[in-house]
């Protein structure tokens, strides 16, 4: 794999724009190549010269594996940073060149540090084609300054978060001791232990403010010495030296004229640190879990903070929250380390390409500047990683390093060959069963039998439920495949725990399994019905779909850790939040599940038919009076509007919390849909006034469909932007083929108006009415599958625009800030 593709594949998707634009810099190098080819038609000869030079270097005498290192050359000072205009260096490659037997070559660039970033001066701009190389270094500087600025901002953010975690750890240790030793405990033995994390955070925060390369290097040396002095559970002497080092860091910052906001907060916190037991007097429980009770409290404007209750149950909850916070924080640190490493590697690669193309020796000079910059020399993130690991292992994994590291660094989920094989096998079985079903219907002439209409009115709605479920699962599997292909971070958007998200193969496995079992039941039903020997067992024949539905429900709610338990519980949680919409804070997974339910209205009506057919009908003889029951017809309205009412309540909740008028318009969309669904249902039930209901249903359905289509394209997908650089689309597109978006918009419009069948009564002589209903419902599911892809693509691009790559993790304790300031 070429480096460019590997570089893109290793990026944090939400930070894509903050990385070095490798492809753009390559295009600048291609401009240099084009110019050289125009002005130097004997370019191949130049290439052979390099090959000859390469062969000559291979024929040099071997210098040995164990040799005395040459005397180090004293380099020029590289001091200076963003605070002033200093010359970073005019380096040369003399050391390496002498070793390789190459004549001394002076570097063609001069790098300066200004207040707004690093600037490179190309010293050979007067040469032919020098303007192209000048532009290249100008763009290179822009990319590096962008990368370093972003990295510095993110490091400052994690340092602030480290301060908060340190406070939480103080409270946790105090709370733990209070629970385990209610009669008192010698705190003096733990004072140093509790301040170690704060000491490192203070030193690291001070290093963030040191923007000069020289300052960063000096702090790096001090940090290494400090890390050697600190041991987990060290002596009071070690703690004292930590405080003294913090004071030294503060003096360095004052001398440099740099105000370290984060480190200042840490020093102030540590200077006014009360005795550890007094920490508990300043904190309360922060109830961040959304419940109906907390919702009612927020409406009544009551505080969600409660006094501390020292029990082992509360201790377990606090530890669980802090454990999750540390894991999330650790992932941030790892991504920051990866960001720094990948960008340094990318700059090294692009500079080597430049040297190869131009036969100059600029890479070493520029890379030395990078190594001495904040991006290359700061080690704050590395030190925090070490401290977080030590803290987590000691306090959250009982000093078991392997256990703690397995939690902090969960292993990547391996694709199992048996899943791939099973999915392919089930796909083949499904295809074979479909062929067998059509063959049985054809050979036994079932469509012309006397009970064909009765079968379609009773058994077909029962089995069509499984078809709707399987189709929706297959569409979701397709969504996952294309989300991964176009690097949509769906697991982050949905909030899946790392390692628990299902891949498209697992989802296909689930869908195909349900499809195979459903087809087996259908074939068994038809076979037993036709076979004279089993025709008498009417109860068993008719109960097959009920058995399958019951089995699916049991597997869905099974509490054991089998059949993808985390995914099943995630779905059930979102489903419950949809049913209790106004009482729970609306999250993206919750309203996405609600949107899926709006496309499964016919499946919900099939479940209603199950209850009526097996509860009050004579299922043995396929006789029921469901359509003649007033209660059943009333529930046709209720069941059909439940998903839309749920989404309407979610929109109202968000309107109340966020004060965003868009949520009000979104709620109006669902209200119009509720009216249209009720009118269409009334039209299909009330045969006495069908003409009036038909007109009303057509008018409101048209209004709702137009409103919903506009909302889909403009707000959910972010398309139809006339001023975009991609006309009528949006500025950022993940799918390179623009025609895909136009095709999707056309399909969404056509499939959105599939309701016309229910109003205009399209009938085909070869298709039963129940078959037509199933086809229309399937088209809506397909439309929803298409909608899902572009909806999450737009959400992902919104995260990219805000560089939002992490979830906010709620913390268990809430500090009284007034007390903090008072102390």
From Swiss-Prot:
It comes from the Eukaryota. Residues 243-256 have a biased composition (Acidic residues). The chain crosses the membrane at residues 421-441, 460-480, 506-526, 543-563, 695-715, 740-760. Residues 627-823 form the EXS domain. The keyword Electron transport does not apply. Induction: Not induced by Pi deficiency. It is found in: Cell membrane. GO terms for cellular component: endosome; Golgi apparatus; plasma membrane; trans-Golgi network. InterPro entries: EXS_C, PHO1_SPX, SPX_dom. PANTHER family: PHOSPHATE TRANSPORTER PHO1 HOMOLOG 5, XENOTROPIC AND POLYTROPIC RETROVIRUS RECEPTOR 1-RELATED. Belongs to the SYG1 (TC 2.A.94) family. This is Phosphate transporter PHO1 homolog 5. It comes from Arabidopsis thaliana (Mouse-ear cress). The lineage of its organism: Eukaryota, Viridiplantae, Streptophyta, Embryophyta, Tracheophyta.
């Amino acid at each position: 794999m070429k480096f460019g593709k590997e570089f893109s594949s290793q990026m944090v998707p939400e930070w894509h724009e903050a990385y070095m634009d490798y492809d753009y810099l390559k295009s600048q190098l291609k401009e240099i190549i084009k110019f050289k080819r125009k002005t130097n038609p004997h370019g191949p000869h130049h290439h052979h010269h390099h090959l000859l030079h390469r062969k000559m270097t291979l024929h040099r005498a071997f210098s040995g594996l164990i040799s005395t290192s040459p005397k180090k050359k004293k380099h020029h000072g590289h001091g200076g940073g963003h605070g002033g205009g200093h010359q970073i260096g005019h380096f040369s490659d003399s050391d390496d060149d002498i070793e390789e037997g190459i004549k001394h070559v002076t570097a063609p660039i001069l790098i300066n540090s200004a207040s707004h970033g690093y600037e490179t001066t190309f010293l050979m701009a007067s040469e032919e084609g020098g303007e192209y190389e000048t532009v290249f270094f100008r763009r290179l500087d822009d990319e590096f300054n962008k990368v370093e600025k972003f990295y510095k901002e993110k490091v400052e953010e994690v340092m602030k978060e480290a301060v908060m975690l340190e406070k939480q750890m103080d409270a946790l240790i105090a709370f733990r001791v209070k629970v385990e030793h209610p009669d008192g405990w010698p705190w003096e033995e733990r004072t140093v232990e509790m301040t170690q994390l704060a000491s490192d955070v203070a030193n690291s925060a001070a290093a963030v403010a040191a923007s000069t390369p020289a300052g960063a290097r000096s702090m790096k040396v001090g940090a290494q010495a400090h890390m050697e002095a600190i041991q987990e559970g060290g002596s009071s002497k070690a703690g004292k030296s930590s405080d003294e080092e913090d004071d030294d860091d503060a003096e360095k910052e004052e001398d440099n004229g740099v105000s370290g906001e984060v480190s200042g907060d840490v020093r102030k916190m540590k200077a006014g640190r009360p005795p550890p037991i007094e920490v508990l007097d300043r904190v309360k429980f922060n109830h961040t879990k959304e419940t109906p009770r907390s919702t009612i409290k927020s409406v009544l404007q009551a505080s969600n903070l409660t006094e501390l209750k020292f029990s082992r149950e509360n201790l377990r909850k606090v530890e669980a929250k802090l454990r999750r916070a540390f894991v999330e924080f650790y992932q941030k640190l790892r991504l920051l380390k990866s960001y720094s490493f990948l960008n340094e590697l990318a700059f090294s690669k692009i500079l080597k390409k430049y040297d190869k193309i131009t036969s100059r020796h600029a890479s070493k000079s520029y890379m030395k500047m990078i190594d001495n910059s904040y991006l290359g020399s700061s080690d704050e993130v590395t030190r925090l990683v070490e401290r977080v690991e030590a803290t987590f292992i000691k306090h959250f994994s009982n000093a078991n390093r392997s256990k703690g590291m397995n939690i902090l660094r969960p292993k990547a989920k391996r694709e199992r060959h048996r899943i791939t094989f099973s999915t392919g096998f089930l796909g083949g079985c499904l295809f074979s069963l479909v062929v067998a079903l059509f063959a049985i219907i054809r050979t036994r002439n079932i469509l012309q039998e006397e009970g064909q209409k009765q079968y379609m009115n009773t058994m077909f709605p029962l089995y069509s439920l499984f078809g709707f479920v399987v189709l929706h699962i297959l569409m979701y599997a397709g969504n996952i495949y294309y989300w991964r292909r176009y690097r949509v971070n769906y697991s982050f958007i949905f909030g899946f725990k790392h390692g628990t998200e299902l891949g498209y193969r697992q989802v296909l496995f689930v869908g195909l399994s349900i499809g195979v079992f459903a087809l087996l039941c259908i074939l068994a039903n038809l076979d037993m019905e036709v076979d004279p020997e089993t025709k008498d067992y009417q109860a068993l024949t008719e109960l097959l779909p009920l058995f399958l539905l019951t089995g699916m429900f049991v597997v869905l709610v099974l509490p054991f850790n089998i059949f993808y338990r985390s995914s099943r519980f995630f779905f059930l949680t979102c489903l419950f939040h949809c049913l209790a919409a106004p009482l729970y804070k609306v999250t993206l997974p919750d309203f996405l599940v609600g949107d899926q339910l709006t496309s499964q209205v016919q499946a919900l009506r099939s479940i209603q038919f199950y209850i009526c057919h097996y509860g009050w009908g004579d299922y043995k003889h396929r006789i029921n009076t469901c359509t003649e029951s007033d209660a059943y017809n009333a529930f046709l309205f209720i069941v059909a509007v439940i998903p839309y009412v749920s989404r309407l309540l979610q929109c109202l909740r968000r309107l109340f919390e966020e004060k965003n008028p868009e949520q009000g318009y979104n709620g109006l969309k669902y209200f119009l849909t509720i009216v249209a669904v009720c009118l269409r249902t009334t039209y299909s039930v009330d045969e006495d006034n069908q003409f009036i209901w038909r007109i009303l249903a057509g008018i409101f359905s048209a209004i709702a469909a137009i409103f919903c289509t506009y909302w889909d394209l403009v707000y959910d997908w972010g398309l139809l932007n006339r001023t975009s650089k991609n006309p009528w689309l949006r500025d950022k597109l993940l799918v390179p083929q623009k025609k895909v978006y136009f095709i999707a918009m056309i399909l969404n419009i056509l499939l959105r108006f599939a309701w016309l069948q229910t109003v205009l009564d399209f009938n085909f002589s070869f298709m039963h009415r129940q078959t037509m209903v199933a086809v229309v419902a399937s088209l809506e599911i397909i439309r929803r599958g298409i909608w899902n892809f572009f909806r999450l693509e737009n959400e992902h691009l919104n995260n990219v625009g805000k560089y939002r790559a992490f979830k906010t993790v709620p913390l268990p304790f809430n500090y009284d800030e007034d007390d903090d300031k008072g102390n």
